[in-house]
Regions:
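Beta-sheet repeat architectures centered on beta-propellers
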Residues: 1-166
Length: 166
């Protein structure tokens, strides 16, 4: 449970298409319906993301180099005119080090090697990137109104790329 979604009662039955919940301000809200947050007077985008676990092609001293990504994303059901998401490749040089840019809160990110961020829309066939690191993770996120997306199986052109130096 992340964020604030105060609900005092829920109702879900096979008769209704979507579950209903009562808010702490005495409103009934239909859940799981639509692409945006319609609880307030105006629609708000729902910030959504998914981040993979870290992966690499070898353990030990080898780095991984990625130069192409086939995103495999679907935007079926979007109400936005041009739906898009941000796809990030997060690389780190050491296990357990922060992999985002800028440095993680409270410290220096000495393990960071590279970060690739590209916008992906329904017409994106492949991304040309240059990312090198010992371990990688993929993050896909959306903060736009009317954007509904589904991630399939992204394909990465990966290869070993030298040894880690000290």
């Amino acid at each position: 449970y992340v964020g604030s979604m105060g609900r005092s009662a829920w109702y879900d039955s096979p008769i209704n298409d979507f579950p209903l919940a009562a808010t702490d301000t005495y409103n009934l809200v239909e859940h799981e319906n639509g692409n945006d947050n319609g609880q307030g007077a105006t629609l708000e985008a729902i910030d959504s993301f998914i981040t993979s676990g870290q992966f690499g092609i070898e353990s030990g001293t080898s780095f991984t180099f990625i130069d192409k990504v086939v995103p495999d994303l679907s935007f079926v059901g979007s109400t936005a005119g041009s739906p898009s998401v941000e796809m990030s490749l997060l690389a780190s040089s050491e296990p357990g080090t922060a992999d985002n840019n800028p440095a993680s809160e409270g410290g220096v990110n000495e393990g960071q090697v590279a970060l690739a961020v590209d916008m992906v829309d329904e017409y994106t066939d492949q991304l040309d990137v240059r990312v090198r690191g010992r371990q990688m993770a993929i993050k896909v996120q959306s903060t736009s109104l009317g954007t509904k997306w589904q991630l399939g199986t992204p394909r990465l052109n990966m290869r070993p790329d030298g040894r880690r130096g000290r």
